[in-house]
Swiss-Prot record:
Enzyme class: transferase
NCBIfam families associated with the record: Diadnylcyc_Halo
The protein's role, per its UniProt record: Diadenylate cyclase that catalyzes the condensation of 2 ATP molecules into cyclic di-AMP (c-di-AMP). c-di-AMP is a second messenger for intracellular signal transduction involved in the control of important regulatory processes such as osmoregulation. Is essential for H.volcanii. Overexpression of DacZ leads to cell death, suggesting the need for tight regulation of c-di-AMP levels. Cannot use GTP as substrate.
Cofactor (UniProt): Mn(2+)
InterPro entries recorded: DAC_DacZ, DacZ_N, Diadenylate_Cyclase_DacZ, DisA, DNA_integrity_DisA_N_sf, DNA_integrity_scan_DisA_N
Cofactor details (free text): Cannot use Mg(2+), Ca(2+), Ni(2+) or Co(2+) instead of Mn(2+) as cofactor.
Native organism: Haloferax volcanii (strain ATCC 29605 / DSM 3757 / JCM 8879 / NBRC 14742 / NCIMB 2012 / VKM B-1768 / DS2)
Lineage of the organism: Archaea, Methanobacteriati, Methanobacteriota, Stenosarchaea group, Halobacteria
Keyword Ribosomal protein: no
Keywords: ATP-binding, Manganese, Nucleotide-binding, Nucleotidyltransferase, Transferase
Domain DAC: 109-266
The name this protein goes by in its record: Diadenylate cyclase
Gene this chain is encoded by: dacZ
Enzyme Commission number(s) of this protein: 2.7.7.85
Length: 269
């Protein structure tokens, strides 16, 4: 019987890269003997792989896990559009147990990896806020389109560069994004003016904030309005991330460092 390494080599012989998702040391060693460039995608590089992409979040959905890992590899110029890769992922827990062939396409570079992996706030918090915006984009408020602005991270500086538009319903509360009840509250309050301010750890610091950063020199695409300009500007003056849902076109956009890093249709997410 052929050695396991030979069988594995045959399976991945014609691909441009082999992506191992969260492998154990023994599992990694089995693939390390193949001639195909191997990339480990995991929360930490515990196997000391030469080529590594951080996976800061756990994705239950295998498709989402692969998409996120591939985009991270594209960000690091490990792969490019046109490459074919083999993704070794786990579907039943434990070590990776399935092999999925993926052709890398340019449209896989959505900005989601940068949003989740490279923001100041906890990646799970960023994802929770992003998913609230996505759901609002899909369903709106009582079937009607709605806009919303979420400023995540560096909450102290954001509060110093903004002022209240109305009573802050979260002033003395200790509620966090990600809680289903809190998410419903966010959706309800999104009908009103102003931004939500959310801490690095996900605490809802305030609603109804009028952002007052200077907009000078902020580069946002033409056609976007005051909500996007305010979101872009506050991320230039602070280390926050802005997630914006447009009422007019229904798209979700994210800003960091004064620049737009993501634009996505909620229906395509």
């Amino acid at each position: 019987m052929a050695a396991l390494s030979e069988l594995l080599g045959d399976l991945v012989a014609d691909v441009d890269g082999l992506f191992l998702f969260t492998p154990s040391s023994s599992h990694y060693e089995q693939f390390a003997e193949t001639d195909v460039p191997t990339v480990v995608i995991a929360p930490e590089n515990t196997v000391e792989a030469e080529t590594f992409v951080e996976l800061p979040l756990q994705f239950q959905n295998v498709k989402d896990r692969i998409r996120f890992g591939v985009e991270g590899a594209m960000e690091q110029s490990i792969v490019e559009a046109g490459d074919t890769i083999a993704c070794n992922v786990g579907t039943f827990g434990g070590d990776p147990d399935s092999l999925v062939r993926v052709r890398v396409e340019e449209n896989m570079r959505s900005g989601i990896y940068d949003l989740f992996a490279n923001s100041r706030a906890d990646p799970g918090v960023i994802r929770d806020v992003f998913e609230v915006a996505i759901e609002l984009g899909k369903k709106g408020q009582k079937g009607e389109p709605v806009g919303a602005l979420f400023i995540v991270g560096d909450a102290g500086k954001v509060m110093n560069k903004s002022r209240p538009l109305s009573y802050n319903p979260f002033e003395k509360s200790h509620v966090y994004v990600g809680d289903p009840i809190v998410n419903v509250m966010l959706k309800e309050f999104s009908r009103l003016d102003g931004a939500f301010v959310i801490s690095d750890s996900g605490k809802i610091v305030s609603a109804y904030r009028y952002l007052e950063p200077s907009a000078e020199g902020v580069d946002i695409p033409k056609g976007l309005g005051a909500r996007h300009m305010a979101g872009g500007a506050i991320t230039r003056d602070t280390n926050a991330t802005a997630i914006v849902l447009s009422e007019s076109d229904g798209l979700v956009r994210a800003f960091k460092g004064g620049k737009m890093i993501l634009e996505i249709d909620p229906e395509a997410y």
